[in-house]
């Protein structure tokens, strides 16, 4: 169970999202706290990415409300919604760096679009953001010269360019090897600690969940089945979330890692 006394930065009330006649999210209510790392998980097609897109205004709900910092998110034609969404950082699964631009130019884009800062100040901010994601020497490189992990870090620097209080990450470890994925997890922890921001991560990677999650939001077939601290989920003896851990652990790409034993011992 979530703590009703904590300060929330995102509040979702009775959210319903439909595609045609199909209900993708059914009566979802939850809160994301200030300075936490929240992991949204569930099987493929359960509505994880749909929930993320609904929060950031990319999908209009059938019913229900979403608030970010007490501002209701409506649609991207609403001035107040646009204003608050400019403050939100998003790291999409593919990273989407522009190949014809250097890393520095990619990271500078949000600053050029949404501020009137002089080029010299933008350059300083870009260097700071690249340092924050451990890419201090990558400014003049092009995306094609970067490894998969470096591309994710560069995209993360761009997402942080405007100093957002809230960062959404959609499957950040997708396509990464175990070592690089673990490094990205450590980076997210460092960013949360040093910048004090709220980070919402959509993932199904068990080791990432164990390492970074303060709270988890578990979806199944569009319904919210668990919403609370990771330790409470691991204490459960049965139920859909336990079945999820058991079902995914043998096929997890980290199966040979000793850290996987943590989940094996906690879900028996």
Where is each model-derived feature located?
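Helix N-cap at the start of a conserved alpha-helix in ABC-type nucleotide-binding domains
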Residues: 178-180
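Conserved ABC ATPase signature
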Residues: 142-146, 150
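Helix-to-loop junction immediately C-terminal to a conserved catalytic motif
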Residues: 56
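Catalytic Walker B motif of ABC-type/P-loop ATPase nucleotide-binding domains
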Residues: 167-170
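Conserved ABC ATPase "signature" region
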Residues: 119-137
